[in-house]
Amino acid sequence: MSDWVSAFAPASIGNVGVGFDVLGLALQGVGDRVQARRVAGEGITVAEVRGLDGEIHPYLSTNTQENTASIAAQAFWDEHGDGGGVELKVHKGVPLQSGMGSSAASAVAAVVAVNGLLEVPLQAEELLVYAIEGEKYASGGLHADNVAPSLLGGLVLCPQILLPEVIRLPVPDGISAALIHPDLQVNTAQARRRLAKSCSTQQWVDQQGLLAGFVAACAASDADLVGKTLRDV
């Protein structure tokens, strides 16, 4: 067995403004922590998952096929590991189904921790493709607007057509986020299945304009323009 390597990944907000599936930001102070160490055997195993209270989590499984941390870590280990075993401990700091990127935080923290076991770790940007695999299990879709900011921090534009390449955006001075969390849970995969499959041409034009305006406002450090673009269509 090796020493434990610990990694923290912050919570995140996806679908920022009109940036559905393509624009996300990281939140400071709240997140998941994953510990990883080398063990005898092969592949990834999950020793325990603990909740916000520090106790064994009542809902999250240690089954490696049902946990975003182990799914992401296994995808990484399959390509960069040495064939040995890795044990994970997951400590949840993000509430489940809260809209704060809980599954993404676990996936990112796991990949970063396992990456730390390598003699020559990969760069952070190279880890995104593996974290996405964990998020894909939870949400049923290929998008990075939670995993990318959780991995890289800050505000990130994640066009699906360019993945795993993403674009980090500057945040204008004076902008902060106030988070209001209703006492309810929404399953991401179920919520996505309820979405309309199409929109009108005018909605699409309006959406493109607001998203482009938001990106331009960030680049110009124009907080007032950012505010004008943060509305739905």
Predicted regions located by residue number:
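ATP-binding N-lobe of GHMP and related small-molecule kinases
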Residues: 1-98, 116, 120-122, 153
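Short, charged, solvent-exposed linker or helix-capping segments at domain edges/interfaces
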Residues: 43-49, 100, 168, 188-193
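Short, basic/glycine-rich phosphate-binding loops at helix/coil junctions
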Residues: 48-52, 110, 224-230
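Charged catalytic carboxylate motif
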Residues: 68, 109, 210
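Short glycine/threonine-rich catalytic loop with a Thr-x-Gly-x-Asp
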Residues: 98-105, 201-206
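ATP-dependent small-molecule kinase catalytic core of the GHMP/sugar-kinase superfamily
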Residues: 123-233
